[in-house]
C-alpha cells in the first residue's frame, strides 16, 4: 500500500472495537465506527466519550484534546462507508463464519489498496483471508489488540500465508504511532499470547471444579506466588467467559490435546449466561459498575 493510513474503518463497536476506534482517533486518524444497528454504533461512541471524560477528570487529557478526539469518530450502520478507507479493522465476535461473512462484504466495498486487519485473538489469519479475493490477500494481516485497548501497550502482529512485507511494515509504523509495542507471531491458532494463556486459565478452572482450591485461593496463589497482577479466574471473568470458551474451542480444534480443552465449569457458566464482569456473574459476582464497564 502506498501513502499513510489516514482513514480507518472499524467494524464492531463493542469492548475491543470502541477502544480501537479511540486510540486511532487520538493520534489524528479519521475513524468510522460500524455496527449493523446504528444505536449500537452510537453506544460505542458514547463509551469512548465516557473514557475521554474520565481522562480529562484525571488530568491525562485537556478538554480540547478529548473533544477533538471524539469529533474524529463517526458512528454508522452503513457498511458502504468503508469505500474510502485506508485501513479496515474487524473486531467482531470470535467466530469464523461471522468474521469471514463480514470480510467477504468489505472486499467488495473497500478500495483495492486498503489494508484489511483482523483483531482475531485465535483464528488463523489464512483462514480469514480466504474470504477475500486473492489479489487482496497480500494486504490482509492480523492486528491483535489487548483490552482495555487505550491502556494495554501490546499489539500482536500476525503474518498470514500471503501477507506482504509492505503490509507488515505499514502496520508496524501505525503501531508505533499508536505508542504500542509489537510482537510478531506465526500464523497458528492462538498466536503467542493466547497459546500461552488459555492452557493456564483452563488448568486453573479445572483446579477449581475439582475442589483443589477456592476461586479466591487459586487467584491469590497466582498473584502472590507467581507475581501476576490478576489471578487466572478473575482474569477470565474480565476477558469474558464466552470469549475464553471461543478461543479454547479454536485451539482445541486447531491443535488438540487436554491442555486446550474447555473445562466443564466454563461450559456450564457460559450456557447459563454467566459470562463474567459484563453480566455481573462468573467465577465471582460483580456490582453494576463492573457490568457497565464490561462491554
PLM feature segments, named:
Residues 17-19, 99, 121-126:
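Short glycine/serine/threonine-rich phosphate/pyrophosphate-binding segments
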